[in-house]
């Protein structure tokens, strides 16, 4: 099917192109579903740490439109189930996390791990297998440092693998740095960004707004 026609997005000084050809571990071209910053309020000031871009396989639009076309953007933005359907849907996803402020690999992986474990415990699905996957996830980041402008890249494959890659200069590498075969981890990394307690409300708003428009066009086909 034809790739949805979407625009590029800019978050701070990070540009996310409208399409991504064959990200690491994938043979597909993905489109930019949405983007936004992750930040925290520190002493009455909103400090932005990372810019997050979320790309989706073209089949995401018909897959999600069945249930969600015709719903207003604010309803999609507030719907936990809508984002859960993106997280668990049978299509590839790619997340680019680009640093606005510097972070170490340890800082990043520990925070993401915490969020993933919290999600699993809330859903009642935390097992030894997930514990091992988290250990591997943390070890992949152990020796990494991320100055401003560098990126962490995740490819989520529908069969349950999470490919992790790194870029220091904004380019997308052809080959992944590591693959972790754990479906719940691959889903939880994305859920930690856009789920019920996701770290980027701006990315959620962007996804809801852009996908809502794409659903309208899909309905006309």
UniProtKB/Swiss-Prot annotation:
Similarity-based family: Belongs to the chalcone isomerase family.
Keywords: Flavonoid biosynthesis, Isomerase
Reaction(s) catalysed (UniProt annotation): a chalcone = a flavanone
Note: Part of the biosynthetic pathway for all classes of flavonoids, a large class of secondary plant metabolites, many of which are brightly colored.
Gene that this polypeptide is encoded by: CHI2
UniProt cross-references to SUPFAM superfamilies, sorted A to Z: Chalcone isomerase
Superkingdom as given in the UniProt entry: Eukaryota
The enzyme's E.C. designation: 5.5.1.6
Site for Important for catalytic activity, residues: 108
Job description of the protein: Catalyzes the intramolecular cyclization of bicyclic chalcones into tricyclic (S)-flavanones. Responsible for the isomerization of 4,2',4',6'-tetrahydroxychalcone (also termed chalcone) into naringenin.
Name under which the protein is recorded: Chalcone--flavanone isomerase 2
List of residues binding substrate: 50, 115, 192
A Pfam family that the UniProt record links to this protein: Chalcone
InterPro entries according to UniProt: CFI, Chalcone_isomerase, Chalcone_isomerase_3-sand, Chalcone_isomerase_bundle_sf, Chalcone_isomerase_sf
Biological process terms in GO annotation: flavonoid biosynthetic process
Pathway: Secondary metabolite biosynthesis; flavonoid biosynthesis
GO molecular function: chalcone isomerase activity
């Amino acid at each position: 099917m034809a790739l949805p026609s979407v625009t590029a997005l800019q978050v701070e000084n990070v540009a996310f192109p409208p399409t991504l050809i064959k990200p690491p571990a994938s043979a597909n071209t993905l489109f930019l579903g949405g983007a936004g910053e992750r930040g925290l309020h520190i002493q009455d000031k909103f400090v932005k740490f990372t810019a997050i871009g979320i790309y989706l396989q073209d089949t995401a639009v018909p897959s999600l439109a069945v249930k969600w076309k015709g719903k207003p953007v604010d309803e999609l933005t507030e719907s936990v189930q809508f984002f859960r359907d993106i997280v668990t849907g049978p299509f590839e996803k790619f997340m680019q996390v680009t640093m606005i402020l510097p972070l170490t690999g340890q800082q990043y992986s520990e925070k993401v791990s915490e969020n993933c474990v919290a999600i699993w415990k809330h859903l009642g699905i935390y097992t030894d297998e997930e514990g091992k996957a988290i250990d591997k996830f943390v070890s992949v980041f152990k020796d990494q440092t991320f100055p401003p402008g560098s990126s962490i890249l995740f490819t989520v494959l529908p069969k349950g693998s999470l490919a992790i890659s790194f870029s220091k200069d904004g380019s997308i590498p052809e080959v992944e740095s590591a693959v972790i075969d754990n479906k719940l981890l691959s889903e939880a990394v994305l859920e930690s960004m856009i789920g019920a307690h996701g770290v980027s409300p701006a990315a959620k708003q962007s996804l809801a707004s852009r996908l809502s428009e794409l659903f309208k066009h899909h309905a006309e086909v």
